[in-house]
């Protein structure tokens, strides 16, 4: 089987960039079973309601949905199981500190396969936006669309 030379996005959490102010991002590996990888390769996953949490000195991806593989029979996985994230000790300590001391949240932004065909998760350290911040984001987005439309009309 030929390896992919580009990054294949499986799931994207577009709502996270609207609801949170992203401070920093980092790439994490995932501990997956065989049927989970096969289901991801078919492009089936949902990380909209998922989040990451520190438990027992490890970081876990909670509430992500990877549906069962159709040909997985009795060896299929549980769709909403907790998945361990693979990070260095230094990265785990930095994330744990940000969550505990600074009141930040770990939010998954994107689930993808890298150039080597390995499933990765783009994890963000983020701070929740207030309602007025969300309104400001909407205003800026509408204004940029309006500017683009006006420039297009003028030629």
Swiss-Prot record:
Gene Ontology cellular component list? cytosol
* GO function terms (MF aspect): RNA binding
List the InterPro entries. Answer: SmpB (IPR023620), SsrA-bd_prot (IPR000037), SsrA-bd_prot_CS (IPR020081)
Q: Which CDD domains match?
A: SmpB
Which keywords does this chain's UniProt record carry?
Cytoplasm, RNA-binding
| GO terms of biological process kind | trans-translation
Location in the cell reads: Cytoplasm
- Family assignment from sequence similarity: Belongs to the SmpB family.
Q: What is known about what this protein does?
A: Required for rescue of stalled ribosomes mediated by trans-translation. Binds to transfer-messenger RNA (tmRNA), required for stable association of tmRNA with ribosomes. tmRNA and SmpB together mimic tRNA shape, replacing the anticodon stem-loop with SmpB. tmRNA is encoded by the ssrA gene; the 2 termini fold to resemble tRNA(Ala) and it encodes a 'tag peptide', a short internal open reading frame. During trans-translation Ala-aminoacylated tmRNA acts like a tRNA, entering the A-site of stalled ribosomes, displacing the stalled mRNA.
What is the protein's given name? SsrA-binding protein
Q: What is the lineage of its organism?
A: Bacteria, Pseudomonadati, Pseudomonadota, Alphaproteobacteria, Hyphomicrobiales
